[in-house]
Curated annotation (Swiss-Prot):
Coiled-coil residue spans: none
UniProt-annotated location(s): Cytoplasm
GO cellular component terms, A-Z: cytoplasm; Holliday junction resolvase complex
Protein source organism: Burkholderia cenocepacia (strain HI2424)
Any one Gene Ontology BP term: DNA repair
Protein name: Holliday junction branch migration complex subunit RuvB
Assembly and oligomerization: Homohexamer. Forms an RuvA(8)-RuvB(12)-Holliday junction (HJ) complex. HJ DNA is sandwiched between 2 RuvA tetramers; dsDNA enters through RuvA and exits via RuvB. An RuvB hexamer assembles on each DNA strand where it exits the tetramer. Each RuvB hexamer is contacted by two RuvA subunits (via domain III) on 2 adjacent RuvB subunits; this complex drives branch migration. In the full resolvosome a probable DNA-RuvA(4)-RuvB(12)-RuvC(2) complex forms which resolves the HJ.
Family: Belongs to the RuvB family.
Residues that coordinate or bind Mg(2+): 76
């Protein structure tokens, strides 16, 4: 991906990844601190309540936890909540940072009893580091090499019992041996508008922003099912309201603010619309191959596949078929277009998920 594409992708207001270190600081201030305050993911939350309480009653570390799902849904927040509910310390790192076995060994040997080690992007661990992790997870021991050459020898170190919480957006990239060592595996799902509305109201309260239920719902409906996006939109709408509406966030104020930001009623921005409009107007609704589509809109193939398409497919606006990408009936309706008869009759032929 060229730098301009990367910059445009990272600066999207509806991007699910953190835009900057400043935004990460802002997110930390809004994070719930206990399970009772955590909105959504009821099934996961209910399971963790049971497992955490059972571990505390037995004075044991919680079993190792794998959290996976799209970015921005609260995996890091849950890791912090787990540590707080267990009453232990949390040590945080990420897969790409742990380049050498010694990096991981230094972390593990400094953990206190029952502490939580949180590894974000755990699918990006190097094979060397992963090999060190296996005995640590199973037996609370690690083997380290001392010395070099013929004089090198392996020394086994005992570790304090601990809980590993791993987070990933790409569970399929985890190796089977690593995945099998997690006793608790939880998938986080996209949030519905009502859940996001509750998150927006809670965040607004923490920010001392005046918002009514309809204003919160308007923001929630455009947040693409993602709390991180909802909180980011809230910040921008709050700015707009303070300048244009005496600080009061109503549905009309939120609508005007988000229209100014080019975020439409279903959460599409200019890049989403550019892709869908290219399929509709340049390729008659599709099918169109990914390389032709990338050339038509001036984006890299990887940007389309990894950044733009997932939400459009998940929401039913785009299909991947063996013959290429196809705009759905929902897309025609969204842009106020009538569906050509040819699209209606050919639709069944394209109704497969694996088109390239």
């Amino acid at each position: 991906m060229i730098e301009t594409d990367k910059l445009a992708t990272e600066q999207r207001i509806i991007a699910a990844t953190p835009a900057s270190s400043h935004e990460e600081v802002f997110e930390r201030a809004l994070r719930p601190r206990q399970l009772d305050d955590y909105v959504g993911q009821e099934k996961v939350r209910g399971q963790l309540e049971i497992f955490i309480e059972a571990a505390k009653r037995r004075s044991e570390p919680l079993d190792h936890v794998l959290l996976f799902g799209p970015p921005g849904l609260g995996k890091t927040t849950l890791a912090h909540i787990i540590a707080r509910e267990m009453g232990v310390n949390l040590r945080q790192t990420s897969g790409p940072v742990l380049e050498r076995a010694g990096d991981l060994a230094a972390l593990l040997t400094n953990l206190e009893a029952n502490d939580v080690l949180f590894i974000d992007e755990i699918h990006r661990l190097s094979p060397v580091v992963e090999e060190i992790l296996y005995p640590a997870l199973e037996d609370y021991q690690i083997d380290i090499m001392i010395g070099e050459g013929p004089a090198a020898r392996s020394v086994k170190l005992d570790l304090q019992p601990f809980t590993l919480v791993g987070a990933t957006t790409r569970a399929g990239m985890l190796t089977n041996p690593l995945r099998d060592r997690f006793g608790i595996v939880a998938r986080l799902e996209f949030y519905d508008a009502e859940q996001l509305s509750r998150i927006v109201r809670r965040s607004a309260s923490l920010l001392n922003a005046q918002i009514d239920p309809n204003g919160a719902l308007e923001i929630a409906k455009r947040a693409r099912g993602t709390p991180r996006i909802a909180n980011r939109l809230l910040r921008r709408v709050r700015d707009f309201a303070e300048v244009k509406a005496d600080g009061q966030i109503t549905a009309a104020v939120a609508d005007a603010a988000l229209a100014m930001l080019d975020v439409d009623p279903v959460g599409f921005d200019l890049m989403d619309r550019k892709l869908l409009e290219a399929i509709l107007y340049k390729f008659d609704g599709g099918p169109v191959g990914i390389d032709n589509l990338a050339a038509a809109i001036g984006e890299e193939r990887d940007t389309i596949e990894d950044v733009l398409e997932p939400y459009l497919i998940q929401q039913g606006f785009l299909q991947r078929t063996p013959r290429g990408r196809v705009a759905t009936l929902l897309t025609y309706r969204h842009f106020g277009l009538s569906v050509p008869d040819a699209r209606r009759t050919e639709r069944d032929e394209w109704d497969t998920p694996d088109g390239k």
